[in-house]
């Protein structure tokens, strides 16, 4: 047994080398061999016994008595040669095989046993043979002679004696030393084997020959058949081999056959040395020799694997070979053993070069086994081993697989450790890991584990992780090893998470296991420190519940609540705060928790929803009547309503909100409580934010509470708390918080920004300065802490209010003075322009829009940088005229902001975390405060430049952060300011104050119109009276409001020229201040307030107070404005404000209560737009704001609001509204044009929503964003113009095509373009025919519809997307920017974008328009569908869907109704929802394809809107050119213009209608307006508008709204309707604003066009080349040369746009600061660049702080107004932004 001996020797050597294992191997080897021997011998016996029984291939027969026995000569010869000789030998010659051989003297049974022993016995059977022979011989009496003769024969024939003689020798040496020649070197399994083997070795009577490789092997058929199933089959049956004398075998070598034959005969346990064991194993498998397989496996285990004892270097490779052999043959047992061994020693095996040669599937199997083997005990060990392996492996090709596997294993180990951290830290291996890390130079593994834990903190595991970390910290080993600091740092972060996510965490199982001490600490800390920091990764659950604390009105009550029920408050706060932090950490839990806590509230909500209208009316009445307490209660009710989805929040909020409301009432009564009111406003805003905001509202309240509690001063604390929590909430729940902040901020920001516009007179100067400062203060206060805020707020509110009053009075006193005094340099020209175009209200409106865009551009630029920035820019613009006021405000506010800033720094830190750069925000805020001051001073200088420079440096970077924070701060501040003002004003005029607040809100709106509306004052008084009546009878009041408003509007419209001039100036101011801020402000405030009131209980209080708040700053400022204007047209303002507020309240209530009120409101809005461009603008803005508020009310809305702001800044929507963003950023306010209104105002509002909406819409937004760029670019194109319906900002086919062609169009882009074209055509046809039954309606109607679609899209988008329209349109940019700046926003945005992308992805299916591949290019319908789906999919937002739907329905009222139907079909507005720009674009296809018709339409509109010449004039020529050329611009301009036309026309028609239908025909008016809107919307939006018609009835709208919105993301459907109307209004308003801020509008339009151009390029080029940079550059190029960017058409339109821009700029020279200091072209370019930068910034929204800094740089770069600088800046910002801005767009495009 050479092999055996060698094998046994080798193991000995191995053992020797192994050392300790030598004994083990010695034991294991023999044991294995004995087992194998027994197995093989038994098998051999069984085989032969079966052969005997089956009588197979027998050749001899024995006859014993009567019984015959068949046997085999070969076996008998081998086993009993003597017997064979005696029985067969003598007769062998004479007998044939057939003849039986008689065996006598032996019984049959005995002979049978004898044969069985012969065949099966493993022992020597000599004794049996002798016994039988003895009997046989005796009986037969055979002669000795015969015996002698026969014996020799026997010997000769069988060689039995020789064989037996040899075999015993073999056996004696058999153990391991048996080494014999040739065939006997293998050990047989038994005696039987030995005997049979002799037959083979020395062939005896063989009966078959086997030929292999030309060699012959003699064998026996019987034994072959018995031993091998293969041979049994071959040698039996009808095969040829069965009858042949020989067989030839293929695929086997003679060596292998020899081994096989030895086994068949002897059951040998070894194989020759040089034989391939793998081949033997394979052969055994093929020939069915199971025993031989066992032998081969034994050889493999012995020689290759050393029986898997301690690994020896020599065995590593052989084990791998064995593994491969086992795998190839399929030997599972051996393969499993090898795998286990390799897994056990993976570090050594993977480093073997031979491991690289293993098949990849085996390598993967090793890895999988390792991963599956992970447990608590070995995880740390495997982590260390994998790390060791990675370090030790050389970086060469053959180690790549091992390195990859080791890295994957390390990741799995870390993930497992994170998941089972509490158990693993108790294992020995983890202690070893800590020791090894302590001894190593760098504790990389521990750092990695801790980082992974930090990144994977969730509400579910946070408590257990905290306990585990505590255990680690308390262990001696940790202290000794010096890891305490690292672990403590992680614990601190975890603690922050728990504090922020307390609301959700407290419901987890592990929470119950925590120590009560920790639980109490977390619960206590949760209120104040919820947003101190943001974790690196947003927790799974993000909720915006924190927004609840936004309720300012709840502040006072919250204070009392806090004071009286501090513990209870803490609980609520803790709950709410948790929810808020949930925004960061556990929105799901928070949401459920809130709902749980809100269960009772839900009931309230349900009741409220039922009584929502009543409540709303009550609230309105109370607001007007000064029923502050009632207002507070209704707010609570409304809030409950708002918190419909978040009962917990409501619950948390309810008492508090009741208190807040009481406080709000008190705040209304007392100036100090204004702070609370401000908070209430915030809270209401938060609540308005929608389901999430609802939760947020609770959270905000809670935060406010918590902060106040923390603070010692409940009152001061609450407001700031709200702001802080809002920020934190924003931070915590990027989306929710952002929503809240955006809602709050956008609302407040909207109110701030929009207040600015609305208070362009008051707010721009006051608002910008004051608001900026108030906002800054508020922001700072809110950011700093709730602490300063109340004081700051009061101070700000008071001083602001005073200054606002003074300045407002001044503003009101002289429109020009107001314009200049208000820093309305643009508005002044606007006013002049408006005066010039007095006959043309539309022109004035357009001019005002233009000027507004300038302001908006600057303001939005600032705002893009930060709410303060925007305000700053607005302020700076107005600063020229408002410097004194701004300075005053700045001084007061700046001081407050600084104080607040200090406090805010604390709050801001949490908020910074929440806001990405809360600190920077604080700094920014302080900077902004300073900047505001600087800007106030600088604003005297060209605000654009100053803003560009100052804002870029201090505020732009801040803008993202600050804009979010500041926005929320601004909102808070504004709310506070508003509330301060309002509160103060409230005390001044409790009832009138409410009315006044409402009036202020309206007055703000009115205040834009006050001068012109002084005549309106009577009407406004009527309105007020009507409004009071309306408050008494909400529905009636709605109608009355509408009637009175219509009357007022009619009157106002009659007076509109003058009104328009002053109003436009005011509105322009307001518009400039915040895009459509006059609307937004007034309506924003009134709507916000009213919506707050109606939408949120807190908001209800807000309405009293928040209206005061919103209207405070706005109303306060607006009040101041109103005071000014009220002084001028105080009653008018009050009445209008009141009416407006009531209207808003009605709207809010309806929003809250019903789509009906909303519809009414919207009708009002729609009708209000009829009031005048300003009023329409205001109404549009109001609508937009209302929608924003609606959005705020809606969870989506909250998202929207947040998105509106954030989305403007951060949201891809901003990108979508590339133009908008810039407009938003720079012209955030200025973008009062359709885009701006939508974006700046609505989108601001919606922006928050856009955040969730952004989340929902984000991807769409992104696409829209990019599309916006595209749309912008495309819109400039001729195709764009005609089809460049991509006005919407979504790139239309033409836009895309144009872009695609001129830039570079990928097939995908072309495809998209084609789809867009098809879609456009389709849209035209579908939209016109299908969607727009009114399509055949006058082209005029179509443009109107388009604008309506725009507004609707914007609003609907806000609504439906809950923030898509606004967020998508312009606020998307700002939201983007904000989101960009805020991590929260980023997270929200990403979430939103993800949702949106999902929507967009899912929406593509619903795409109504063929061929639209790119969402960005999927214009309205597809985007709408997508957005719709997105919105639908975005259930967070949908949480509020019922209430929001109702609200939305009511808010979006008539518009929503069409959208309900259209939502099903994903009408343009739906798409618009998804991508407001796209929607617009699509709609714009219809619209813009009608844009060509737009000329006609415009003409018609001009005819229809002869009064609205603003649009007609500008729109006809400029606007048509702008529209076409600026189809992108058209989005803004034409949208604005068209919307203006629509709005104006609608207004005019409505006005006419209203004039005709005053009062009694309000419904008809509304319906008419709805019809107009419907027609417009339908024309614009296709089916949606048809739906609009259907939805027209206010009553229907609420139902449809609520149902549809519930169905189709209620908001989406309803939003579509409402938004369409609102959009219409908004668009009108935007158009008005755009028109009124003509320069800005054009600039905006151009900027938008540029942006659109950029977007198309971005969308088209970006796909292949265009990033944000490209987009930016393209924008810049577009700005510098739209012609280059656009196609020839684009160029043509670009020229037109430029011409328009230049005209606008020239008109707006004084207004356009940029124009002032720079040549027109440069100014335009700069303006566009600024917008582009803002958009780019928006594009880079995800980058958050970085973007802010980048934006600062950009701003600084742009500040020179140097084209190259701007371009460079654009490129720079593009790069920063491109990854997420353009990339996302590309991603979305790619998805399609």
Curated annotation (Swiss-Prot):
Location in the cell: Cell projection, Axon; Presynapse; Cytoplasmic vesicle, Clathrin-coated vesicle; Nucleus
GO cellular component: AP-2 adaptor complex; axon; extrinsic component of synaptic vesicle membrane; neuron projection terminus; nucleoplasm; nucleus
GO aspect biological process, one term: synaptic vesicle budding from endosome
Assigned keywords, A-Z: Cell projection, Cytoplasmic vesicle, Nucleus, Repeat, Synapse
Keyword match Nucleus: yes
Region: Disordered, residue numbers: 528-554, 581-658, 670-692, 707-768, 788-815, 831-989, 1151-1283, 1519-1607
Extent of Low complexity compositional bias: 866-877, 1250-1259
InterPro entries (UniProt xref): BACK_BTBD8 (IPR043225), BTB/POZ_dom (IPR000210), BTBD8_BTB_POZ_1 (IPR040121), BTBD8_C (IPR027907), SKP1/BTB/POZ_sf (IPR011333)
Domain BTB: 58-127, 206-273
Biased composition regions of type Polar residues, renumbered to the chain: 541-552, 588-601, 724-740, 838-865, 947-956, 1151-1160, 1195-1215, 1597-1607
Tissue-by-tissue expression: Highly expressed in fetal brain. Weakly expressed in adult brain and prostate.
Compositional bias ranges of the Basic and acidic residues kind: 602-625, 640-650, 744-758, 878-891, 927-939, 969-987, 1566-1594
Principal place of residence: other
SUPFAM superfamilies: POZ domain (SSF54695)
Protein purpose: Involved in clathrin-mediated endocytosis at the synapse. Plays a role in neuronal development and in synaptic vesicle recycling in mature neurons, a process required for normal synaptic transmission.
Subunit composition and interactions: Interacts (via N-terminus) with adapter protein complex AP-2 subunits alpha (AP2A1) and beta (AP2B1).
Protein name stated in the entry: BTB/POZ domain-containing protein 8
Lineage: Eukaryota, Metazoa, Chordata, Craniata, Vertebrata
Gene name per UniProt: BTBD8
């Amino acid at each position: 047994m050479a092999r055996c001996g060698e094998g046994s020797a080798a193991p000995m050597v191995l053992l020797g080398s192994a050392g300790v294992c030598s004994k083990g191997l010695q034991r294991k080897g023999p044991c294995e061999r004995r087992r194998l021997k027994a197995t093989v011998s038994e098998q051999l016996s069984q085989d032969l016994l079966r052969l005997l029984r089956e009588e197979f291939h027998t050749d001899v027969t024995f006859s014993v008595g009567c019984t015959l026995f068949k046997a085999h000569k070969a076996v008998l010869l081998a086993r009993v040669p003597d017997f064979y000789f005696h029985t067969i030998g003598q007769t062998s010659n004479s007998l044939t095989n057939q003849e039986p051989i008689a065996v006598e003297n032996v019984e049959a049974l005995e002979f049978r046993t004898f044969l069985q022993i012969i065949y099966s016995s493993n022992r020597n059977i000599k004794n049996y043979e002798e016994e039988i022979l003895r009997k046989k011989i005796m009986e037969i009496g055979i002669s000795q002679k015969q015996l002698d003769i026969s014996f020799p024969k026997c010997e000769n024939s069988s060689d039995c004696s020789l064989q037996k003689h040899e075999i015993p020798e073999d056996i004696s040496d058999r153990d391991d030393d048996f080494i014999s020649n040739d065939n006997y070197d293998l050990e047989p399994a038994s005696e039987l084997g030995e005997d049979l083997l002799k037959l083979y070795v020395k062939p005896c009577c063989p009966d078959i020959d086997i030929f292999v490789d030309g060699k012959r092997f003699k064998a026996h058929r019987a034994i072959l058949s018995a031993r091998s199933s293969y041979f049994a089959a071959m040698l039996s049956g009808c095969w040829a081999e069965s009858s042949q004398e020989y067989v030839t075998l293929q695929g086997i070598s003679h060596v292998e056959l020899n081994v096989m034959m030895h086994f068949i005969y002897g059951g040998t346990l070894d194989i020759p040395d040089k034989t391939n064991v793998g081949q033997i194993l394979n052969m055994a498998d093929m020939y069915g020799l199971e025993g031989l397989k066992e032998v081969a496996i034994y050889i493999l285990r012995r020689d290759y694997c050393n029986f898997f004892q301690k690994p020896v270097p020599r065995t590593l490779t052989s084990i791998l070979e064995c593994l491969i052999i086992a795998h190839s043959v399929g030997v599972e047992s051996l393969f499993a053993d090898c795998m286990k061994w390799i897994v056990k020693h993976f570090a050594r095996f993977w480093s073997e070069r031979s491991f690289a040669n293993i098949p990849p599937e085996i390598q993967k199997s090793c890895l999988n086994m390792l991963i599956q083997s992970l447990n608590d005990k070995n995880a740390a060990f495997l982590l260390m081993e994998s790390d060791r392996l990675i370090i030790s492996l050389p970086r060469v090709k053959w180690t790549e697989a091992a390195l990859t596997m080791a890295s994957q294993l390390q990741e799995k180990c870390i993930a497992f450790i994170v998941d089972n951290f509490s158990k693993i830290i108790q294992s020995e291996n983890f202690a070893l890991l800590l020791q090894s890390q302590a001894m190593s130079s760098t504790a990389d593994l521990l750092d990695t584990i801790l980082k992974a834990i930090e990144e994977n903190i969730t509400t579910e595991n946070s408590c257990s992780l905290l306990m585990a970390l505590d255990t680690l910290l308390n262990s001696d080993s940790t202290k000794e090893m010096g890891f305490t600091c690292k672990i403590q740092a992680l614990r601190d972060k975890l603690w922050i998470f728990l504090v922020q996510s307390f609301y959700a965490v407290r419901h987890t199982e592990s929470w119950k296991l925590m120590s009560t001490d920790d639980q109490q600490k977390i619960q206590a800390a949760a209120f104040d420190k919820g947003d101190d920091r943001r974790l690196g990764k947003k927790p799974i659950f993000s909720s915006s519940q924190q927004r609840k604390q936004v309720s300012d009105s709840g502040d006072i009550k919250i204070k009392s609540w806090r004071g009286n029920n501090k513990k209870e408050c803490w609980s609520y706060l803790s709950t709410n705060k948790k929810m808020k932090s949930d925004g960061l950490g556990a929105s799901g839990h928070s949401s459920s928790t809130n709902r749980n806590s809100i269960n009772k509230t839900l009931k309230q909500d349900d009741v409220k929803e039922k009584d929502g209208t009543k409540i709303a009316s009550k609230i309105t009445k109370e607001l007007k009547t000064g029923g502050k307490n009632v207002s507070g209660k209704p707010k609570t009710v409304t809030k409950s309503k708002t918190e419909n989805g978040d009962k917990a929040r409501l619950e948390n909020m309810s008492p508090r909100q009741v208190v807040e409301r009481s406080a709000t009432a008190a705040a209304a009564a007392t100036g100090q409580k204004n702070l609370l009111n401000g908070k209430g406003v915030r809270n209401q805003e938060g609540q308005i934010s929608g389901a999430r905001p609802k939760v947020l509202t609770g959270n905000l309240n809670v935060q406010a509470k918590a902060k106040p509690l923390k603070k010692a001063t409940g009152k001061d604390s609450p407001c700031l708390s709200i702001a802080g929590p809002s920020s934190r909430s924003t931070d915590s729940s990027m989306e929710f918080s952002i929503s809240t902040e955006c809602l709050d901020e956008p609302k407040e920001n909207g109110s701030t920004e929009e207040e600015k516009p609305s208070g362009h007179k008051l707010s721009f100067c006051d608002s910008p300065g004051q608001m900026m400062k108030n906002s800054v203060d508020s922001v700072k206060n809110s950011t700093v802490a709730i602490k300063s805020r109340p004081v700051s707020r009061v101070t700000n509110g008071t001083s602001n209010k005073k200054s606002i009053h003074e300045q407002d009075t001044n503003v009101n006193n002289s429109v020009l003075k107001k314009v200049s005094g208000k820093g309305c340099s643009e508005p002044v020209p606007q006013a002049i322009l408006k005066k010039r175009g007095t006959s043309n209200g539309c022109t004035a409106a357009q001019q005002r829009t233009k000027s507004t865009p300038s302001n908006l551009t600057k303001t939005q630029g600032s705002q893009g940088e930060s709410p303060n920035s925007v305000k700053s820019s607005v302020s700076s613009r107005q600063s020229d005229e408002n410097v004194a006021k701004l300075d005053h405000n700045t001084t007061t506010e700046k001081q407050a902001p600084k104080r607040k800033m200090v406090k805010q720094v604390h709050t801001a830190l949490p908020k910074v975390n929440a806001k990405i750069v809360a600190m920077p925000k604080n700094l920014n805020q302080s900077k902004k405060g300073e900047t505001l001051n600087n800007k106030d001073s600088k604003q005297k200088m060209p605000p654009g430049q100053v803003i560009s420079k100052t804002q870029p440096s201090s505020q732009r970077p801040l803008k993202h952060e600050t804009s979010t924070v500041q926005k929320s701060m601004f909102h808070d501040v504004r709310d506070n300011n508003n509330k301060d003002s309002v509160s103060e004003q409230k005390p001044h005029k409790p009832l009138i104050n409410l009315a006044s607040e409402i009036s202020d809100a309206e007055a703000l709106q009115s205040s834009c119109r006050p001068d012109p509306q002084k005549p309106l004052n009577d009407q406004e008084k009527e309105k007020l009276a009507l409004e009071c009546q309306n408050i008494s009878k909400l529905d009636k009041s709605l109608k009355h409001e509408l009637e009175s408003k219509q009357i007022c509007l009619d009157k106002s419209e009659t007076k509109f020229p003058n009104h328009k001039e002053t109003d436009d100036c005011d509105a322009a101011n307001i518009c400039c201040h915040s895009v459509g801020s006059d609307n937004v402000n007034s309506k924003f405030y009134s709507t916000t307030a009213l919506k707050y009131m109606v939408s949120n209980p807190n908001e209800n209080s807000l309405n009293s107070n928040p209206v005061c708040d919103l209207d405070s700053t706005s109303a306060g400022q607006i009040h101041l404005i109103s005071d000014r204007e009220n002084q001028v047209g105080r009653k008018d303002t009050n009445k209008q404000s009141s009416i407006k507020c009531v209207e808003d309240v009605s709207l809010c209530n309806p929003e809250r209560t019903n789509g009906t009120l909303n519809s009414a409101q919207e009708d009002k809005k729609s009708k209000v737009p009829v009031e005048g461009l300003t009023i329409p603008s205001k109404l549009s803005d109001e609508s937009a704001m209302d929608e924003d508020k609606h959005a705020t009310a809606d969870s989506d809305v909250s998202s929207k609001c947040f998105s509106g702001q954030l989305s403007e800044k951060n949201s891809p929507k901003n990108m979508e509204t590339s133009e908008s963003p810039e407009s938003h950023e720079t012209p955030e306010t200025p973008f009062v044009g359709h885009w701006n209104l939508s974006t700046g105002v609505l989108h601001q509002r919606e922006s928050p929503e856009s955040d969730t909406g952004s989340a929902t819409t984000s991807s769409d937004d992104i696409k829209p964003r990019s599309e916006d760029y595209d749309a912008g670019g495309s819109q400039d194109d001729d195709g764009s113009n005609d089809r460049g319906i991509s006005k919407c900002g979504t790139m239309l086919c033409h836009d895309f095509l144009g872009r695609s062609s001129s830039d570079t169009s990928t097939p995908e882009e072309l495809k998209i373009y084609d789809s867009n074209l098809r879609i456009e055509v389709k849209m035209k046809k579908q939209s016109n025919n299908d969607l727009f039954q009114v399509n055949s309606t006058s082209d005029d109607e179509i443009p109107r519809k388009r604008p309506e679609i725009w507004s609707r899209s914007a609003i609907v988008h806000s609504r439906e997307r809950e923030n898509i329209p606004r967020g998508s349109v312009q606020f998307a940019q700002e939201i983007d920017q904000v989101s960009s700046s805020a991590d929260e926003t980023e997270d929200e945005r990403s979430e939103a974008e993800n949702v949106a992308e999902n929507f967009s992805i899912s929406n593509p299916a619903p795409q109504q328009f063929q061929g639209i591949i790119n969402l960005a290019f999927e214009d309205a319908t597809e985007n709408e569908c997508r957005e719709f789906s997105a919105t639908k999919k975005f259930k967070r937002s949908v949480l509020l869907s019922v209430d929001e739907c109702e609200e939305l329905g009511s808010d979006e009222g008539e518009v929503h109704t069409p959208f309900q139907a259209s939502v099903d079909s994903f009408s343009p507005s739906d798409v618009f929802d998804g991508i407001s720009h796209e929607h617009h674009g699509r709609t714009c296809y219809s619209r813009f394809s009608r844009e060509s018709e737009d000329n006609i339409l415009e003409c018609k509109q001009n005819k229809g809107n002869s009064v609205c010449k603003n649009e007609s004039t500008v729109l006809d020529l400029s606007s048509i050119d702008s529209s076409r050329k600026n189809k992108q611009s058209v989005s803004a301009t034409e949208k604005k213009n068209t919307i203006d036309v629509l709005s104006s026309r609608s207004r005019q028609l409505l006005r006419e209608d209203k004039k005709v239908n005053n009062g009694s025909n309000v419904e008809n008016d509304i319906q008419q307006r709805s019809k107009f809107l419907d027609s417009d919307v339908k024309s614009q939006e296709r089916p949606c508008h048809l739906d609009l018609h259907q939805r027209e009835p206010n009553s229907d709208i609420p139902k449809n709204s609520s149902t549809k919105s519930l169905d189709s993301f209620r908001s989406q459907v309803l939003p579509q309707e409402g938004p369409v109307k609102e959009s219409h209004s908004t668009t009108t308003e935007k158009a008005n604003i755009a028109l009124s801020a003509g320069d800005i509008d054009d600039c905006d339009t151009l900027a938008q066009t540029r942006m659109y151009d950029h977007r198309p390029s971005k969308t088209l080029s970006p796909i292949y080349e265009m990033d944000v940079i490209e987009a930016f550059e393209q924008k810049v190029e577009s700005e510098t040369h739209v012609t280059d960017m656009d196609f020839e058409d684009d160029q043509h339109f670009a020229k037109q746009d430029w011409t328009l821009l230049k005209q606008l700029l020239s008109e707006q020279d004084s207004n356009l600061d940029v124009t002032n200091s720079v040549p027109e072209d440069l100014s335009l370019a700069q303006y566009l660049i600024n917008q582009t930068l803002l958009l780019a910034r928006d594009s880079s929204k995800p980058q958050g702080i970085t973007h802010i800094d980048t934006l600062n740089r950009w701003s600084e770069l742009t500040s020179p107004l140097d084209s190259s600088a701007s371009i460079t800046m654009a490129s720079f910002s593009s790069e920063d932004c491109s990854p997420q801005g353009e990339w996302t767009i590309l991603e979305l495009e790619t998805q399609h």
